[in-house]
């Protein structure tokens, strides 16, 4: 059976082309002894296999065989593409691989049915384009194994929302350029959360900018609250 999943602790999680940017960064945090909730990745190759075995890939290729149309037409194509992904059956071996990884995660957590978040983790092949996490709809929350295959397909389908298509079109989008994995990670209730990123400083180097909020970072991602902001030399 093909390997459809990679745990964040496994060496394969170093490969952005397999696990996507977000999962790769989580693996690096683990390597540096930073505490990260347990999880695994449904690999980018799994999406390729799903599209091929379900017939969805041929339907999507037909939809995107011409240049993307104007706004109204784009909305129609987007809806058809999303429906194609969500309406296609996942093969038994792919579903079994994903459920098997979830059950292994449950044993790690000593929990019968761990609550997990299921965002998409994208890499552009072969590193031609920047990565913008906020472009994609994300983070379904699953409470047991029965909804997991649906959540994974929803993550894949987020590649074909109008927002995603506009972004891809703006950077010279091609179907073959996009490789998307799905991160399945134990969902915890944080006391505080946030994001950290680098920004140029006045001397030509980089400082670290940290934006933090109480509770979940979802409020920060959606712009609902004003974060505490710190700049570190």
Where are these regions (language model features)?
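N-terminal beta-alpha lobe that positions the nucleotide/phosphoryl donor
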Residues: 1-183, 190-192
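Short conserved micro-motifs at the rims of enzyme active sites and ligand-binding pockets
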Residues: 129-130, 195, 219-224
